[in-house]
Regions:
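Short, flexible loop segments at the rims of nucleotide/cofactor-binding pockets, characterized by
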Residues: 90-95, 119, 187-188
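N-terminal helical cap/lid subdomain that shapes the substrate entry/recognition surface
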Residues: 2-101, 105-110
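Residue-level detector of anion-binding/catalytic polar loops
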Residues: 35, 113, 190
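Asp-based, Mg2+/Mn2+-dependent phosphohydrolase catalytic module
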Residues: 1-3, 105-108, 121-232
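Conserved SAM-binding loop
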Residues: 14, 96, 114-117, 149, ...
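Short, contiguous strand/loop micro-motifs
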Residues: 12-13, 89-91, 112, 116, ...
Length: 232
């Protein structure tokens, strides 16, 4: 089936928000002489229903100092607030990753509809799209607020395809995380894997195409993804 629409992930695909998200938690862990390892963080990438970094911190502290663990557990709201401040400070100067703007402009010129399907909440995604002045490129923006379960479940991509009034097989998904790639495949969408700074350190599952950057591809080649032999 010919590709008729593009569905973009957000975090790590359009903007490298995953680096400050991880780094901000690592900074909080350092406050308690703890280490947050990438292999522990990995299940959280591309979803909102995996790893709880605060609960993990309490668990690690309990092995060393049960009393301190109790205090940290009780201070959850304060710790999350500090982490949010750090995350926003680290994210302040971020922009679109290479190739994103060009692909959006090409899709608009061709009349190809685009959507965003993200496991983050709506205020986060819409805030970024507005700040980066790209919201108008998207016919639909689907977030964790729109589904009962996020990636790796297929719900976000199925809903995005429905909002675009297209079958999933006609919607090409652009994803950076293993959870997102699994979700796209479960939805029946063709998927291009574009690992980011953080997800590039993880094993990436099979996809229809693997890229190091969206700057390495153009819209014409994406549209013919399922028919051009050089994509195999």
């Amino acid at each position: 089936m010919e590709i008729a629409a593009l569905i973009f992930d957000f975090d790590g695909l359009m903007v490298d928000t995953e680096s400050p998200t991880l780094t901000s938690w690592q900074m909080v862990y350092t406050d308690y002489a703890l280490e947050l390892r990438l292999e522990d963080w990995a299940p959280a990438l591309g979803t909102n229903n995996g790893f709880d970094p605060h609960a993990h911190m309490v668990k690690l502290l309990n092995e060393r100092d049960p009393y301190q663990a109790v205090l940290v557990a009780a201070a959850r709201d304060e710790i999350l607030a500090r982490r949010d401040v750090l995350k926003h400070e680290l994210s302040a100067d971020l922009g679109l990753l290479p190739g994103v703007a060009e692909l959006l402009e090409a899709a608009a010129a061709e009349g190809m509809p685009c959507a965003v399907a993200s496991s983050s909440n709506r205020s986060w995604v819409e805030g970024w799209l507005g700040r980066l002045a790209v919201r108008h490129y998207f016919r639909a923006v689907l977030t964790a607020d729109d589904v009962r379960v996020t990636k790796p479940a297929p719900d976000l991509f199925l809903l995005a395809a429905a909002r675009l009034d297209l079958p999933p097989a006609a919607c090409l998904v652009l994803e950076d995380s293993p959870n997102g790639i699994h979700a796209a495949r479960a939805a029946g969408c063709p998927v291009v894997a574009v690992p980011g700074v953080v997800t590039g350190q993880l094993p990436i599952p099979p996809a229809d195409l693997h890229l190091t950057s969206l700057a390495d591809i153009d819209l014409l080649r994406l549209r013919t993804l399922r028919t051009k032999a050089w994509f195999q």
